[in-house]
Amino acid sequence: MLWRGDARVGFRVGEVGSGAAGGRERFEAGVARVLEYIRAGDVYQVNLAHRLSASFEGDPRALMAALVRAGLPRHGAYVEFTDDAGRPRVIASASPELFLEYEPASCGGGVGTLRTRPMKGTRGTGSASESAVARELAGSAKDRAELAMIVDLMRNDLGRVCDLGSVRVESAHAIEKHGEGDAGLLQATATVAGTPRAGLRWSEVFAAMFPGGSVTGAPKIRAMQIIDELEEARRGPYCGSVGVFLPDGSAMCNIAIRTACITGERDHAGMLRSGTLDWWVGAGIVADSTPEGEWAETLAKAAVLRAAIGSGT
């Protein structure tokens, strides 16, 4: 067990622990294996993740409200649906990360802008000075290298669907704060944009760009093969995307990180009121990563969940 949730208004989450046998040992062994692949020249970066799980009782919408209060997500999302097995499921996402945004041309004519904002590099502020932590993150050669690799990957992906020569890096490196208090995290981000080809369909955009580079690695296909080999289960909604497409042509799709996925049974009213909560956390593995350091980074990414559900023991 990593921690136990407190009773909250509208819901309760039980003991939070690893969702698969091996837990920390399995994850750190996976990091070591990724480092072997990197040294062999197979890959430059792999985003390796593991699953935290707990029992859930109550109203998933109350959990979503708690995640919003704790994480102040810029790209949060809430979805209720029934899976292929007929089970009720909920996605409660407190995502800070933008996968894709389409901004129509302001003049009402012509083609607008397609934009992506990958994140790489995470720090919890804890008791330290926020400005000091921000300076350390901004100066971290490891985190800058992680982000630079993904910026190059996303430039390439955008180039597959945008006009020749239109892809540009609007911001190569910026530090953003997401969440407050114990849930507050500092993130290194970049912004890449381009002018999509006229007549482009969203199906073509997703075929070229999904899943996001920040949650896979580089090169993307080889990184995904390694993820499939080393992670204990399919990710499901985690690291996918939830989006909205508006009548004016604008659209915004997140990367489904910092996301609770609840699977359960229906009550007499047909609502999900109990089940299992899964919360995946991951880290970008590069040549100078250490298994211990990457494990610690993954747990920092559970801060918003811990703040939302409480941390009783």
State each model region's role:
Residues M1-T313:
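Extended alpha-helical targeting/anchoring segments
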